[in-house]
Amino acid sequence: HPKAILPFARQMFAFGHHEMGKEVCVEFERIMGSRQDLDEETRSWLMGTYELLLCYAEYNDLSVMLPHIHKTKKLLENRKALIPWPDTGLNDSLSLLYMYHRKAGELENETRLFSEYNPLYSSLIGGRLDGADLIMQAERLYVTGAFQEAEIEVYKALLVIHRDKQWHTWLCAVMLQIRIALARGNWHTIEHLLGEVE
């Protein structure tokens, strides 16, 4: 059954076995092409979950991920993906910019793409990345030297993070606060924030 193959493909990508994951995806497409017995709702559900998987497989290339996430949202509508999706997509990173900035001169565009991508992706995983787009914007401001504006964006993100208990993104926000404090030579703030992280 096509439902059984999707979790396996997801695990292949999660463990870094991309070639094997792609082979499983080819098999899924073959199975879906031969299954004329599936009703339209089930087919949309399966294909929506598959598009989410393809998005996951293209991790950190936002220009490729974005079309997949739009297709996922359209196919799933307000339903959850067919398989559990525990990942926030942060992969234990302390910086969203570190994860998604790929090319010199593209920072502004990458931030814009992430601002479009993140609300869609977050809504598909139960809102577990709400506020991450604000952190990405704050990091962009930080690396361009706009420390005060970056700090304001971090506080906006923290309002969302605390409201929704988004602890996956909280650490990214605090680490950015530490970097801002370090740039200002504010050791008291750094000690306080490190105490929060502990």
Q: What is each residue range found by the language model?
A:
Residues 139, 179, 184-188:
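Cytosolic nucleotide-utilizing catalytic cores of signal-transduction proteins
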Residues 149, 189-192:
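Alpha-helix N-cap and coil->helix boundary residues
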Residues 1, 191-198:
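Short, intrinsically disordered, charge-balanced linker/junction segments flanking boundaries
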